[in-house]
Design a protein with these regions (language model features):
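N-terminal assembly/interaction segments in proteins that build large macromolecular machines
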Residues: 2-291
Length: 291
């Protein structure tokens, strides 16, 4: 009976405030406030402790649902992007999920972490991002996992642009070199290139950036194909070079036809806009992450 009267003494206002702060249930908030003798800070700590205990049981359950979240600094010089996974698409569409993802992306652009672990060990306003994610797990009731993180920096004369496609299924960042102040044509070009990358998933920025092993493997395949056609060696070599050029146009960003204007390559479109594409990042939800 005593416990019931103690719970009754906790004001509805405090319970409501604690619920808004923590996302915990009404009775959990009442009990925590009672245990903390009405101290809101201590009650929050009690719920956090209990929430973390619940959250720990969910570790490893995040799947391929979630969102890609990107952010660009106010000066346009840095971009950050993360893939945050959840167990269900329902949770991935909540404001709480978006809030956590935005914090992670903002930290990525500000600190350029080289790994997920480095990102989660960062502190923002006195709170480790790892703890922020864990608290979100407790509040939302299912596991979250930061799958990968990236950072992109603009050249001294230039900026970073971002684009999120299909509600967070794909995210892109593009670094553009352009004269300052940046002209509208360069801004429009950056946006178009971001969307282009989302659609085409290029393997590299330029030929020089393609992994040698990938080019060598393609050359071997093309050599075998050309040789099987019984052509003279000098013709075979020309066929290989021609087919390699076609391969580069399919996988190299600067050589691809711009989706919005296929008659122009991305490189040519950038040149006409008085800009140059110098880097990009692309995340697609659930795809195999590079080691």
């Amino acid at each position: 009976m005593t416990g019931g009267s103690e719970l009754a003494e906790i004001s509805a206002g405090k319970v409501k405030e604690l619920r808004e702060q923590t996302g915990a249930g009404m009775m959990d908030c009442k009990k925590a406030l009672s245990e903390a003798n009405g101290d809101m800070t201590r009650a929050g700590e009690i719920l956090r402790e209990k929430g973390i205990a619940k959250a720990s049981k969910r570790v490893g359950r995040a799947g391929s649902e979630g969102r890609v979240i990107a952010a660009v600094s106010e000066d346009g010089k840095h971009g950050g992007m993360v893939e945050l996974n959840s167990e269900t698409d329902f949770v991935a569409k909540t404001d709480d999920f978006a809030h956590v993802g935005t914090h992670l992306a903002q930290a990525a652009l500000a600190h350029a972490p080289k790994s997920v672990e480095e990102l989660l060990d960062l502190s923002v306003k006195g709170e480790k991002l790892r703890d922020k994610v864990t608290a979100a797990v407790a509040k939302m009731g299912e596991d979250l996992a930061v799958r990968r993180v990236t950072h992109l920096q603009a050249p001294a004369s230039g900026f970073v642009a971002s684009y999120i496609h299909a509600g967070g299924k794909i995210g892109t960042l593009v670094a553009i070199e352009a004269a300052i102040p940046v002209k509208p044509e360069a801004r429009a070009l950056a946006h178009n290139v971001c969307m282009h990358i989302a659609a085409t998933s290029p393997a590299s920025l330029s030929r020089d950036d393609l992994p040698k092993a990938l080019v060598d493997a393609e050359r071997r395949v093309l050599t075998a194909q050309a040789a099987s056609e019984g052509k003279p060696p000098n013709i075979v070599e020309k066929m290989i070079e021609g087919r390699l050029t076609k391969f580069f146009k399919e996988v190299v960003l600067l050589e691809q036809g711009l989706v919005m204007d296929p008659d122009k390559t991305v490189g040519k479109a950038a040149q006409e806009a008085g800009a140059r594409v110098v880097g990009f990042r692309r995340f697609q939800l659930g795809e195999a992450a590079e080691e």
